[in-house]
């Protein structure tokens, strides 16, 4: 456990450096997302470090924009789609309050402002990218956060293995420095999946240049925590992402991937093998398909257009991001959500057609595979709605938008 003075000290230093240059604040956000973003102290309960830094970054960014007389929102292909998703979220909250389907207006607006925070993170990262050096700075920041997070995972499970009742020791979520257990292991694993795919794509794109070793190390170190999270959706998403990378961009690595698929399972502990055997359609129907059916039955009779309102129930109620979006924001919100995801993939594809630098291509390829992986993981999880994986997704997507703007 870290002392409280260190927690506050890191937050203050990140805030101070932000006023010098916004990229320092974005670096602080990327690392805070990766390590332990939620703290419980005597002064503040459940304080998220990146939220504190986000306020400082936004204020510094706002002042910089006013000083330079630049438009607040940088132009990206996703601006209108982001505006549409923010609009549908706001409408769902307002109508949920008016119709009485939203238990608390505070919870509704909290969820909407968190969405706005993600949009601002996306725009600030995209706006800060002015050169290849900026891309490398922010990319390394994101990867350092993921490496630190992976190290925590290794400490919690792999290095402190216990055979008591056949279960490993530790909470293994790399989420809270102190206080009760935080997020589920599958949310932690989904965060690592996206970063692992970015690291793998960047390593393959840079190979055989010396710079390929760092992203390769990132990808390698994240695999063990992902596997030992026992998250079937995260493991399936990782496999889909790897096959997306090899099938679309790096076919020369496909034989190596296929060989690894044969060798690695034989090396896994029996406990993990049993968990992986649960990756089946029958299991999915029993454990997850009910969420879709429940969302339709509970939403259509009440308010099919805008749903019950953001935050009316926890994510565990429907167990996947699509049913949750339908129930919370209705058909209109689901359309906005899917349109935004399609826009992300389209932007990434356009960017790949415009850039030739192997470093830039590696990042965009990894983000493309990560987006596909999150779409698949969303069938039985909430990677694009849960805080930590959604933050890393929009950080990297903002970097792709910045590359698109170069």
Predicted feature locations:
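Membrane-embedded alpha-helical segments of multi-pass membrane proteins
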Residues: 2-13, 35, 47-64, 112-120, ...
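A membrane-periplasm/extracellular boundary helix in multi-pass inner-membrane enzymes
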Residues: 151, 157-160, 226-229, 246-284, ...
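A conserved mid-to-late transmembrane alpha helix and its immediate loop/hinge
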Residues: 223, 314-350, 376-378
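Membrane-interface loop/short-helix elements at transmembrane-helix boundaries
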Residues: 173-186, 269-308, 313-329
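N-terminal hydrophobic segments of proteins, predominantly signal-anchor/transmembrane helices
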Residues: 17-44, 50-116
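Membrane-interface junctions at the ends of membrane-embedded or membrane-associated helices
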Residues: 65-73, 126-138, 204-212, 252, ...
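Transmembrane alpha-helices of multi-pass inner-membrane enzymes
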Residues: 255-259, 369-377, 383-406
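Alpha-helical transmembrane segments of multi-pass inner-membrane proteins
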Residues: 9-17, 86-90, 94, 116-124, ...
């Amino acid at each position: 456990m870290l002392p409280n003075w260190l927690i506050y000290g890191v937050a203050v230093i990140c805030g101070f450096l932000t006023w010098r240059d916004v990229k320092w604040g974005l670096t602080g956000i990327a690392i805070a997302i990766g390590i332990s973003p939620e703290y419980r102290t005597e002064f503040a309960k459940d304080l998220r470090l990146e939220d504190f830094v986000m306020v400082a970054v936004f204020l510094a960014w706002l002042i910089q924009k006013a000083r330079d007389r630049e438009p607040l929102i940088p132009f990206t292909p996703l601006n209108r789609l982001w505006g549409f998703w923010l609009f549908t979220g706001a409408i769902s909250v307002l109508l949920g309050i008016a119709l009485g389907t939203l238990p608390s207006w505070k919870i509704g607006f909290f969820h909407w402002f968190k969405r706005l925070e993600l949009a601002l993170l996306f725009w600030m990262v995209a706006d800060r990218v002015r050169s290849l050096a900026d891309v490398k700075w922010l990319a390394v920041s994101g990867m350092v956060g993921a490496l630190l997070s992976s190290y925590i995972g290794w400490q919690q499970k792999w290095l402190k293995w216990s055979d008591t009742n056949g279960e490993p020791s530790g909470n293994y979520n790399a989420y809270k420095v102190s206080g009760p257990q935080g997020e589920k292991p599958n949310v932690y694993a989904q965060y690592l999946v996206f970063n692992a795919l970015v690291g793998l794509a960047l390593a393959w794109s840079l190979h055989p240049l010396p710079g390929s070793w760092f992203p390769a190390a990132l990808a390698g170190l994240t695999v063990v925590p992902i596997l030992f999270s026992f998250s079937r959706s995260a493991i399936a998403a990782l496999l889909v992402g790897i096959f997306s990378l090899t099938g679309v961009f790096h076919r020369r690595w496909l034989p190596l991937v296929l060989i690894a698929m044969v060798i690695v399972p034989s090396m896994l502990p029996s406990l993990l093998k049993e968990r992986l055997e649960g990756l089946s359609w029958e299991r999915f129907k029993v454990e997850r398909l009910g969420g879709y059916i429940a969302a339709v039955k509970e939403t259509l009779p009440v308010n099919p257009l805008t749903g019950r309102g953001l935050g009316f129930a926890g994510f565990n109620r429907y167990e996947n991001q699509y049913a949750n979006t339908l129930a919370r924001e209705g058909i209109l919100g689901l359309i906005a959500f899917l349109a935004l995801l399609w826009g992300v993939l389209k932007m990434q594809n356009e960017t790949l057609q415009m850039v030739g630098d192997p470093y830039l291509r590696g990042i965009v390829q990894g983000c493309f595979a990560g987006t596909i992986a999150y779409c698949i993981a969303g069938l039985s999880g909430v990677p694009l709605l849960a805080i930590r994986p959604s933050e890393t997704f929009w950080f990297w997507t903002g970097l792709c938008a910045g590359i698109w703007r170069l």
